[in-house]
Regions:
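Fe(II)/2-oxoglutarate oxygenase catalytic core
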Residues: 1-118, 123-170
């Protein structure tokens, strides 16, 4: 994946920043899902922004099943609660795979232009793009929502991203 923001909002192009600010103004996962009441967006958009899965050699890009890092890269007492993705590729025809938190329930969601995807993050929220449309790059806009946690809770969480291309879906 390319274009992932690690440098702060001043490095995001103005039109993209306007769209991201609009989404966080009106999209509140606490109200929509009711699973948390304390998730907030990181307005520096660390780990978010424009993301692209490139189409290498006209064979299609690939983003295997993975769990994102749960702890924020610069605010070590922030835990990722939700990932929100906006589909930006109009002609892309594939799916977004999601394993629910117990690691057993599988969902396949069609990737659509201008569709907003959101899911609750955990150490077992596996997701990826195993089927890629050949000849096209997949572009998304990503925004992460976080909660504040104690040092003790942070120390009990596996902090690094995990990858597994051998997950089987029933």
């Amino acid at each position: 994946v390319q274009w992932c923001n690690r440098l702060g909002r001043e490095n995001i192009a103005s039109p993209v920043l306007i769209l991201m600010d609009y989404i966080v103004t009106y999209f509140d996962p606490n109200k929509i899902f009711g699973l948390t009441d304390n998730a907030f967006p990181d307005l520096s958009y660390y780990g978010g922004g424009m993301m692209m899965t490139p189409n290498k050699n006209e064979e299609g890009g690939y983003l295997g099943m993975h769990v994102d890092a749960i702890i924020h890269g610069t605010n070590k007492n922030w835990k990722r609660e939700y990932s929100v993705l906006l589909g930006l590729s109009e002609e892309y025809d594939s799916s977004f795979d999601l394993l629910v938190h117990n690691g057993k329930e599988h969902g396949r969601i069609p990737y659509k232009f201008n569709r907003l995807y959101a899911f609750k993050c955990s150490e077992n929220s596996w997701h990826g793009l195993p089927e890629i449309t050949k000849g096209l790059d997949k572009k998304t806009l990503g925004i992460m929502y976080w909660s504040k946690i104690s040092d003790e809770e942070r120390d009990s969480i596996e902090t690094k991203a995990k990858f597994n291309d051998n997950l089987e879906f029933n």
